[in-house]
Amino acid sequence: MKRVGLITIVAALLLLVACRSQGGQDAVHEGGDTLTVQSQLLTLTRFDNYVVADVNDPWNDGRLLSRYVLVGDSCDSAQLPDGVVVNVPLGSSLVYSSVHAGVINELGCVDAVTAVCDAQYYSMPSIIDRLANGLVVDAGSSMSPDVEKIISHNPAAILCSPFQNAGHGAIERLGIPVIECADYMEASPLGRAEWVKFIGLLYGEYDKADSIYNAVAVAYDSLKNIVAKVPARPTVISEMVTDGVWFMPGGGSYMAEVFADAGADYVWADDNSTGSLQLDFATVYDRAHDADFWLIKTFGRDLTLAQLESDYALHARMAAFAHGGVYSCNTGATSLFEDFPFHPEVLLREYVKIFHGNMLPVYELKYYKPVK
Protein backbone atom coordinates (compact mmCIF):
# COMPACT_ATOMS: atom_id res chain seq x y z
CA MET A 1 0.00 0.00 0.00
CA LYS A 2 1.38 3.43 -0.93
CA ARG A 3 2.07 5.89 1.85
CA VAL A 4 -0.38 8.52 0.55
CA GLY A 5 -3.12 5.91 0.34
CA LEU A 6 -2.36 4.72 3.87
CA ILE A 7 -2.59 8.25 5.29
CA THR A 8 -5.87 8.83 3.46
CA ILE A 9 -7.39 5.67 4.88
CA VAL A 10 -6.21 6.50 8.41
CA ALA A 11 -7.78 9.94 8.14
CA ALA A 12 -11.03 8.43 6.95
CA LEU A 13 -11.08 5.94 9.81
CA LEU A 14 -10.50 8.69 12.33
CA LEU A 15 -13.58 10.47 11.01
CA LEU A 16 -15.59 7.28 11.47
CA VAL A 17 -14.57 6.70 15.10
CA ALA A 18 -17.47 5.76 17.34
CA CYS A 19 -19.16 8.71 19.03
CA ARG A 20 -18.09 9.61 22.55
CA SER A 21 -20.42 11.03 25.13
CA GLN A 22 -20.04 14.17 27.20
CA GLY A 23 -21.96 13.19 30.34
CA GLY A 24 -20.55 13.15 33.85
CA GLN A 25 -18.96 10.06 35.39
CA ASP A 26 -19.87 10.32 39.06
CA ALA A 27 -23.41 9.01 38.67
CA VAL A 28 -22.73 6.70 35.76
CA HIS A 29 -24.05 3.58 37.51
CA GLU A 30 -27.14 5.11 39.14
CA GLY A 31 -30.38 3.58 37.97
CA GLY A 32 -28.72 0.64 36.23
CA ASP A 33 -28.67 -3.08 36.91
CA THR A 34 -25.30 -4.58 37.84
CA LEU A 35 -24.60 -7.74 35.87
CA THR A 36 -21.32 -8.81 37.52
CA VAL A 37 -20.85 -10.46 40.90
CA GLN A 38 -17.45 -12.15 41.27
CA SER A 39 -15.14 -10.05 39.09
CA GLN A 40 -12.91 -7.51 40.82
CA LEU A 41 -11.77 -5.85 37.60
CA LEU A 42 -14.98 -5.70 35.56
CA THR A 43 -18.28 -3.99 36.33
CA LEU A 44 -21.14 -4.30 33.87
CA THR A 45 -24.12 -1.99 34.39
CA ARG A 46 -27.16 -2.30 32.13
CA PHE A 47 -29.49 0.57 31.33
CA ASP A 48 -32.48 0.71 28.97
CA ASN A 49 -30.53 1.62 25.83
CA TYR A 50 -26.91 0.83 26.65
CA VAL A 51 -24.51 -1.07 28.90
CA VAL A 52 -21.53 0.49 30.69
CA ALA A 53 -18.49 -1.76 31.03
CA ASP A 54 -15.89 -0.46 33.49
CA VAL A 55 -12.48 -2.15 33.50
CA ASN A 56 -10.49 -1.40 36.64
CA ASP A 57 -6.74 -0.88 36.43
CA PRO A 58 -5.14 -4.11 37.76
CA TRP A 59 -1.95 -2.25 38.68
CA ASN A 60 -3.47 0.84 40.37
CA ASP A 61 -6.17 0.29 42.98
CA GLY A 62 -9.12 2.62 42.61
CA ARG A 63 -8.20 3.71 39.10
CA LEU A 64 -10.26 3.05 35.99
CA LEU A 65 -8.34 1.52 33.09
CA SER A 66 -11.10 1.81 30.49
CA ARG A 67 -14.82 2.51 30.19
CA TYR A 68 -16.89 1.22 27.31
CA VAL A 69 -20.45 2.19 26.45
CA LEU A 70 -22.10 -0.59 24.47
CA VAL A 71 -24.97 0.60 22.28
CA GLY A 72 -27.17 -0.79 19.54
CA ASP A 73 -27.43 0.50 15.99
CA SER A 74 -28.10 4.14 16.91
CA CYS A 75 -26.04 6.30 19.21
CA ASP A 76 -27.33 9.50 20.83
CA SER A 77 -24.17 10.89 22.39
CA ALA A 78 -26.04 13.43 24.49
CA GLN A 79 -27.63 10.67 26.57
CA LEU A 80 -24.55 8.55 27.18
CA PRO A 81 -21.89 8.69 29.89
CA ASP A 82 -18.25 9.29 29.04
CA GLY A 83 -16.50 6.30 27.54
CA VAL A 84 -15.50 4.58 24.34
CA VAL A 85 -18.74 3.90 22.49
CA VAL A 86 -18.87 0.45 20.91
CA ASN A 87 -21.67 -0.45 18.51
CA VAL A 88 -22.85 -3.97 19.25
CA PRO A 89 -23.22 -6.71 18.28
CA LEU A 90 -19.83 -6.77 16.63
CA GLY A 91 -19.97 -8.06 13.08
CA SER A 92 -16.19 -8.14 12.72
CA SER A 93 -13.27 -8.04 15.13
CA LEU A 94 -9.52 -8.46 15.48
CA VAL A 95 -8.86 -10.83 18.38
CA TYR A 96 -5.34 -10.96 19.79
CA SER A 97 -5.72 -14.02 22.03
CA SER A 98 -6.83 -17.56 21.27
CA VAL A 99 -8.40 -17.58 24.75
CA HIS A 100 -10.91 -14.93 23.75
CA ALA A 101 -11.43 -16.44 20.31
CA GLY A 102 -12.27 -19.71 22.03
CA VAL A 103 -15.05 -18.26 24.15
CA ILE A 104 -16.38 -16.30 21.16
CA ASN A 105 -16.54 -19.62 19.34
CA GLU A 106 -18.36 -21.18 22.29
CA LEU A 107 -20.93 -18.39 22.07
CA GLY A 108 -21.55 -19.29 18.44
CA CYS A 109 -20.05 -16.07 17.08
CA VAL A 110 -16.82 -17.28 15.49
CA ASP A 111 -17.86 -15.72 12.16
CA ALA A 112 -17.32 -12.33 13.82
CA VAL A 113 -13.65 -13.19 14.45
CA THR A 114 -12.35 -11.83 11.16
CA ALA A 115 -8.72 -11.18 12.11
CA VAL A 116 -6.30 -12.63 14.67
CA CYS A 117 -2.82 -12.06 16.03
CA ASP A 118 -0.33 -14.83 16.82
CA ALA A 119 -2.08 -17.19 14.41
CA GLN A 120 0.52 -19.90 15.06
CA TYR A 121 -0.85 -20.41 18.58
CA TYR A 122 -4.43 -21.09 17.50
CA SER A 123 -5.53 -24.71 17.76
CA MET A 124 -9.27 -24.26 17.10
CA PRO A 125 -10.24 -25.93 13.81
CA SER A 126 -12.78 -23.20 13.08
CA ILE A 127 -10.10 -20.50 13.13
CA ILE A 128 -7.44 -22.60 11.40
CA ASP A 129 -9.84 -23.41 8.55
CA ARG A 130 -10.92 -19.80 8.19
CA LEU A 131 -7.30 -18.66 8.10
CA ALA A 132 -6.54 -21.18 5.37
CA ASN A 133 -9.57 -20.06 3.35
CA GLY A 134 -8.78 -16.37 3.69
CA LEU A 135 -11.84 -15.66 5.83
CA VAL A 136 -9.67 -14.60 8.76
CA VAL A 137 -6.83 -12.10 8.38
CA ASP A 138 -3.47 -12.90 9.97
CA ALA A 139 -2.52 -9.57 11.56
CA GLY A 140 0.91 -10.73 12.71
CA SER A 141 2.34 -10.63 16.20
CA SER A 142 0.28 -9.26 19.07
CA MET A 143 3.41 -7.43 20.25
CA SER A 144 3.77 -5.67 16.89
CA PRO A 145 0.64 -6.11 14.77
CA ASP A 146 0.56 -5.31 11.06
CA VAL A 147 -1.06 -1.87 11.03
CA GLU A 148 -1.56 -1.78 7.26
CA LYS A 149 -3.44 -5.08 7.35
CA ILE A 150 -5.61 -3.83 10.19
CA ILE A 151 -6.40 -0.61 8.34
CA SER A 152 -7.26 -2.53 5.20
CA HIS A 153 -9.46 -4.95 7.13
CA ASN A 154 -11.07 -2.24 9.31
CA PRO A 155 -12.59 -4.43 12.05
CA ALA A 156 -15.40 -3.04 14.18
CA ALA A 157 -13.30 -3.54 17.33
CA ILE A 158 -9.97 -4.90 18.56
CA LEU A 159 -9.86 -7.24 21.57
CA CYS A 160 -6.48 -7.32 23.30
CA SER A 161 -4.87 -7.85 26.71
CA PRO A 162 -3.44 -4.78 28.48
CA PHE A 163 -0.01 -4.74 30.08
CA GLN A 164 1.38 -2.57 32.86
CA ASN A 165 2.80 0.77 31.69
CA ALA A 166 2.29 -0.18 28.04
CA GLY A 167 0.00 1.32 25.44
CA HIS A 168 -1.08 -0.09 22.10
CA GLY A 169 1.03 2.08 19.81
CA ALA A 170 -0.34 2.97 16.40
CA ILE A 171 -3.40 0.79 16.98
CA GLU A 172 -4.77 3.42 19.35
CA ARG A 173 -4.72 6.03 16.59
CA LEU A 174 -6.77 4.12 14.04
CA GLY A 175 -10.16 5.17 15.33
CA ILE A 176 -11.13 1.56 16.05
CA PRO A 177 -12.38 0.78 19.58
CA VAL A 178 -9.67 -1.11 21.48
CA ILE A 179 -11.27 -3.41 24.06
CA GLU A 180 -8.82 -4.08 26.89
CA CYS A 181 -9.56 -7.56 28.21
CA ALA A 182 -7.86 -7.61 31.60
CA ASP A 183 -9.46 -10.89 32.61
CA TYR A 184 -6.06 -12.59 32.88
CA MET A 185 -5.26 -10.34 35.84
CA GLU A 186 -8.23 -11.54 37.90
CA ALA A 187 -7.10 -13.28 41.08
CA SER A 188 -10.11 -15.59 41.39
CA PRO A 189 -11.21 -18.34 39.00
CA LEU A 190 -14.87 -17.33 38.93
CA GLY A 191 -13.91 -13.67 38.70
CA ARG A 192 -12.08 -14.34 35.47
CA ALA A 193 -14.76 -16.66 34.13
CA GLU A 194 -17.34 -13.91 34.59
CA TRP A 195 -15.74 -11.94 31.75
CA VAL A 196 -17.72 -14.23 29.43
CA LYS A 197 -20.62 -11.86 30.13
CA PHE A 198 -18.68 -8.94 28.63
CA ILE A 199 -17.79 -11.02 25.57
CA GLY A 200 -21.44 -12.03 25.27
CA LEU A 201 -22.56 -8.40 25.32
CA LEU A 202 -20.01 -7.47 22.66
CA TYR A 203 -21.22 -10.19 20.30
CA GLY A 204 -24.95 -10.04 21.04
CA GLU A 205 -25.14 -13.26 23.05
CA TYR A 206 -25.45 -12.08 26.64
CA ASP A 207 -28.14 -14.59 27.64
CA LYS A 208 -26.04 -17.50 26.40
CA ALA A 209 -22.96 -16.08 28.14
CA ASP A 210 -24.87 -15.67 31.39
CA SER A 211 -26.04 -19.28 31.19
CA ILE A 212 -22.50 -20.48 30.53
CA TYR A 213 -21.19 -18.56 33.54
CA ASN A 214 -23.94 -19.79 35.86
CA ALA A 215 -23.25 -23.41 34.88
CA VAL A 216 -19.52 -22.90 35.44
CA ALA A 217 -20.09 -21.32 38.86
CA VAL A 218 -22.40 -24.12 39.99
CA ALA A 219 -19.99 -26.84 38.81
CA TYR A 220 -16.97 -25.13 40.38
CA ASP A 221 -18.58 -24.38 43.73
CA SER A 222 -20.19 -27.82 43.99
CA LEU A 223 -16.87 -29.63 43.59
CA LYS A 224 -15.08 -27.10 45.80
CA ASN A 225 -17.60 -27.65 48.62
CA ILE A 226 -17.27 -31.43 48.39
CA VAL A 227 -13.47 -31.29 48.47
CA ALA A 228 -13.53 -28.93 51.44
CA LYS A 229 -14.48 -31.90 53.62
CA VAL A 230 -11.40 -34.03 52.84
CA PRO A 231 -9.62 -35.16 56.02
CA ALA A 232 -6.09 -34.70 54.66
CA ARG A 233 -4.67 -32.05 52.37
CA PRO A 234 -1.43 -32.77 50.48
CA THR A 235 1.13 -30.03 49.89
CA VAL A 236 1.85 -28.76 46.38
CA ILE A 237 4.27 -26.54 44.47
CA SER A 238 4.32 -25.44 40.85
CA GLU A 239 6.64 -24.95 37.85
CA MET A 240 10.44 -25.39 37.82
CA VAL A 241 13.79 -23.65 37.40
CA THR A 242 14.10 -21.81 34.07
CA ASP A 243 17.35 -20.00 33.28
CA GLY A 244 18.26 -20.06 36.96
CA VAL A 245 14.92 -18.69 38.18
CA TRP A 246 11.97 -20.59 39.63
CA PHE A 247 8.79 -18.70 38.77
CA MET A 248 6.45 -19.70 41.57
CA PRO A 249 2.83 -18.45 41.63
CA GLY A 250 2.24 -15.96 44.42
CA GLY A 251 0.06 -16.95 47.35
CA GLY A 252 -2.62 -14.49 46.30
CA SER A 253 -2.67 -15.67 42.70
CA TYR A 254 -5.32 -17.39 40.64
CA MET A 255 -3.41 -20.69 40.73
CA ALA A 256 -2.98 -20.56 44.49
CA GLU A 257 -6.74 -20.26 44.88
CA VAL A 258 -7.41 -23.21 42.57
CA PHE A 259 -4.91 -25.33 44.52
CA ALA A 260 -6.71 -24.50 47.76
CA ASP A 261 -10.14 -25.14 46.25
CA ALA A 262 -8.87 -28.52 44.98
CA GLY A 263 -8.02 -29.60 48.52
CA ALA A 264 -4.27 -28.97 48.63
CA ASP A 265 -2.07 -26.80 50.81
CA TYR A 266 0.01 -24.58 48.57
CA VAL A 267 3.44 -24.11 50.14
CA TRP A 268 3.46 -20.35 49.37
CA ALA A 269 -0.14 -19.78 50.50
CA ASP A 270 1.00 -17.31 53.16
CA ASP A 271 2.36 -14.96 50.48
CA ASN A 272 0.05 -12.16 49.29
CA SER A 273 1.51 -11.66 45.81
CA THR A 274 -0.92 -12.04 42.91
CA GLY A 275 1.84 -12.45 40.32
CA SER A 276 4.79 -14.83 40.13
CA LEU A 277 7.59 -14.98 42.68
CA GLN A 278 11.10 -15.12 41.23
CA LEU A 279 12.98 -17.55 43.44
CA ASP A 280 16.23 -19.47 43.29
CA PHE A 281 16.37 -23.22 43.77
CA ALA A 282 17.86 -22.99 47.25
CA THR A 283 14.91 -20.93 48.48
CA VAL A 284 12.40 -23.38 47.03
CA TYR A 285 14.28 -26.42 48.28
CA ASP A 286 14.61 -25.05 51.79
CA ARG A 287 10.89 -24.51 52.07
CA ALA A 288 9.29 -27.05 49.76
CA HIS A 289 11.63 -30.00 49.20
CA ASP A 290 9.15 -32.36 50.84
CA ALA A 291 6.04 -31.17 48.95
CA ASP A 292 3.76 -34.08 48.04
CA PHE A 293 2.93 -32.86 44.54
CA TRP A 294 4.81 -30.85 41.95
CA LEU A 295 2.87 -29.55 38.94
CA ILE A 296 4.74 -28.29 35.87
CA LYS A 297 3.58 -26.72 32.61
CA THR A 298 5.75 -27.12 29.50
CA PHE A 299 5.33 -26.11 25.87
CA GLY A 300 6.04 -28.49 23.03
CA ARG A 301 7.38 -31.45 24.99
CA ASP A 302 6.13 -34.23 27.23
CA LEU A 303 8.39 -34.04 30.26
CA THR A 304 10.22 -37.06 31.68
CA LEU A 305 12.07 -37.38 34.98
CA ALA A 306 15.32 -37.73 33.06
CA GLN A 307 14.66 -34.47 31.21
CA LEU A 308 13.68 -32.73 34.41
CA GLU A 309 16.95 -33.76 36.00
CA SER A 310 18.87 -32.86 32.84
CA ASP A 311 17.32 -29.38 32.81
CA TYR A 312 18.53 -28.78 36.35
CA ALA A 313 20.25 -31.56 38.27
CA LEU A 314 19.03 -30.43 41.68
CA HIS A 315 15.41 -30.99 40.62
CA ALA A 316 16.02 -34.66 41.49
CA ARG A 317 16.39 -33.73 45.16
CA MET A 318 12.71 -32.84 45.48
CA ALA A 319 10.66 -35.48 47.32
CA ALA A 320 7.93 -35.51 44.67
CA PHE A 321 10.57 -36.46 42.10
CA ALA A 322 11.29 -39.71 43.91
CA HIS A 323 7.76 -40.52 45.07
CA GLY A 324 5.75 -40.18 41.84
CA GLY A 325 4.28 -36.80 42.69
CA VAL A 326 5.41 -34.90 39.58
CA TYR A 327 2.74 -34.11 36.95
CA SER A 328 3.22 -32.08 33.81
CA CYS A 329 1.03 -30.52 31.15
CA ASN A 330 2.33 -29.99 27.62
CA THR A 331 0.44 -26.79 26.81
CA GLY A 332 1.47 -27.04 23.18
CA ALA A 333 -0.31 -30.37 22.78
CA THR A 334 -3.38 -29.71 24.93
CA SER A 335 -6.03 -27.00 25.03
CA LEU A 336 -5.39 -26.11 28.69
CA PHE A 337 -4.72 -22.41 28.09
CA GLU A 338 -7.76 -22.10 25.83
CA ASP A 339 -10.09 -23.97 28.19
CA PHE A 340 -9.46 -23.02 31.80
CA PRO A 341 -9.77 -19.19 31.77
CA PHE A 342 -13.53 -19.31 31.15
CA HIS A 343 -14.01 -22.85 32.46
CA PRO A 344 -12.07 -23.05 35.73
CA GLU A 345 -14.16 -26.05 36.72
CA VAL A 346 -12.15 -28.17 34.26
CA LEU A 347 -8.89 -27.15 35.95
CA LEU A 348 -10.36 -27.73 39.40
CA ARG A 349 -11.52 -31.20 38.34
CA GLU A 350 -8.05 -31.98 37.00
CA TYR A 351 -6.35 -30.99 40.25
CA VAL A 352 -8.86 -32.81 42.43
CA LYS A 353 -8.13 -35.96 40.43
CA ILE A 354 -4.40 -35.51 41.06
CA PHE A 355 -4.66 -34.65 44.77
CA HIS A 356 -7.64 -36.85 45.71
CA GLY A 357 -8.04 -39.40 42.93
CA ASN A 358 -10.55 -41.53 44.82
CA MET A 359 -13.03 -38.64 44.84
CA LEU A 360 -13.34 -38.76 41.03
CA PRO A 361 -12.94 -42.47 40.23
CA VAL A 362 -14.36 -42.24 36.70
CA TYR A 363 -12.65 -39.03 35.59
CA GLU A 364 -9.47 -39.39 33.52
CA LEU A 365 -6.83 -36.68 33.37
CA LYS A 366 -7.21 -34.54 30.25
CA TYR A 367 -4.31 -32.09 30.50
CA TYR A 368 -1.74 -33.38 32.99
CA LYS A 369 0.22 -36.64 32.97
CA PRO A 370 2.35 -38.25 35.67
CA VAL A 371 6.01 -37.66 34.86
CA LYS A 372 7.97 -40.92 34.68
For each predicted feature, which ranges?
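A short, structured surface patch at a secondary-structure boundary
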Residues: 54-55, 59-151, 158-163
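Flexible, glycine-rich surface segments
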Residues: 223-306
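C-terminal soluble interaction/assembly domains
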Residues: 268-270, 274-359, 363-372
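Bacterial N-terminal signal peptides
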Residues: 7-17
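Positively charged n-region of N-terminal signal peptides that target proteins for export
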Residues: 1-5
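Extracytoplasmic substrate-binding proteins
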Residues: 135, 146, 152-245, 269-270, ...
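Structural recognition of the beta-strand scaffold that forms the well-ordered cores
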Residues: 92-95, 112-116, 157-161, 178-181, ...
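Bacterial Sec-exported substrate-binding components of ABC uptake systems
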Residues: 19-101, 208-237, 322, 335, ...
